[in-house]
Amino acid sequence: MSRWIVRSIFCVVGKWSSGEPCPIALLSFVTVCTIGVETSCDETAVAVMEADEKGCRLCGEALATRPEEHSALGGIVPELTVRQHLELLPRLMVEAKQKAGARKVQAVGATAGPGLAPALLVGLSFGKALAWSQGNSFFAINHLEGHLFSPFVSQGKLPEYPHVALIVSGGHTLLVEASGPQKRKILGTTRDDAAGEAFDKLARMAGLGYPGGAALEKEARMGKKGRMSLPRPMKGTEGCDFSFSGLKNAARLLIEKNPEIARPGEARSNFCAEVQAAINESLVDRASAALKETGISTFTVSGGVSANQGVLQALKSMAQDRGVTLHCAAGGWNTDNASMIAAVAARRALDGQSSDWDADADPRWSVAR
């Protein structure tokens, strides 16, 4: 599989320069221009970014996703995802470069994990081929590290330290203490489902389709919490871990007793409002515990679920009550994107780090360092 992917991509990106050595390390730059490639799941994205020690600026970005194709099949299909990445990457690269204009690129970064292994291999191979053909350095980037950067990058800044970060998405829910660019400690993670996965599965139980997190949020606005009873997972327990399997099971039993929940109407709206409140309270409780444990006064939130306004408002209220500075990934920066990958590559280029030509895809790559 990987040989076929590499061979296919080199036909698109360009040929290796005969007899010319590939750059192994970068000297420190005052200003650096990087390209980021993101293919950890079903989104295909490319971005061009300039950065220096004062901040960063997005020069060009192109993203494509086809959720309807996966939705029709009930979830993400790896083989379909690989084919989409192979088809879309060359076009998106051209589009991002055209938006950025003529710029000298110093480094390329591509997501190497965590994520779907076949999808990661496509982006990783594409990034290496692009970097080699242009004489750039190459960095394998941790997808979750990208999410740690996104709340700052969306404000035109590189990360400030120390901070506590909540990454909450369909595939990940964790709290991280970041004390430096390469100093990260996981404070808590989910013991089963991610919060975004819980939203999607509970939405499907309520007859809202899959993925249905956004539909559940919309339905919740028309309902009232407290009209039904669901548990608040892990609330008040020791540590900072999450768990959503108990909530999912309780919701299933509730729907079995009240089948009208799975049909349009007041019962469905009230159910969604209770689900929204349960997940909100769980996230707030765990984040508050992490801030108390570390004593850090800067808090960030990123990942696709942070686009949920109910979740975001609950976290904002918690931060305000605790007197904590909150940085949120804005707009498209909260979901998977290549800009955050380009930003991490820029940080490494500014630090003069060595290239990662031998890096392989790692579907379970931890963000802890």
Question: Could you say what each language-model-derived stretch is?
Answer:
Residues 32-114, 143, 147, 271:
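N-terminal beta-alpha supersecondary unit
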Residues 179-222, 248, 253-256:
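Glycine-rich phosphate-binding loop plus the immediately following alpha-helix
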Residues 61, 218-299, 308-322, 349, ...:
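A contiguous, well-structured pocket-lining segment that forms one wall/lid of small-molecule binding clefts
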Residues 140-141, 316-341:
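Conserved phosphate-binding/catalytic loops in two-lobed NTP-binding clefts
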Residues 44-50, 165, 173-177:
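Short beta-strand scaffold segments in enzyme catalytic cores
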Residues 147-149, 329-367:
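Glycine-rich phosphate-binding/hydrolytic loop that grips phosphoryl groups
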Residues 140-164, 344:
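Conserved phosphate-binding catalytic cores of ATP/NTP-utilizing and phosphoryl-transfer enzymes
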Residues 2-11, 16-18, 22:
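Low-acidity, Ser/Thr- and Arg-rich intrinsically disordered low-complexity segments
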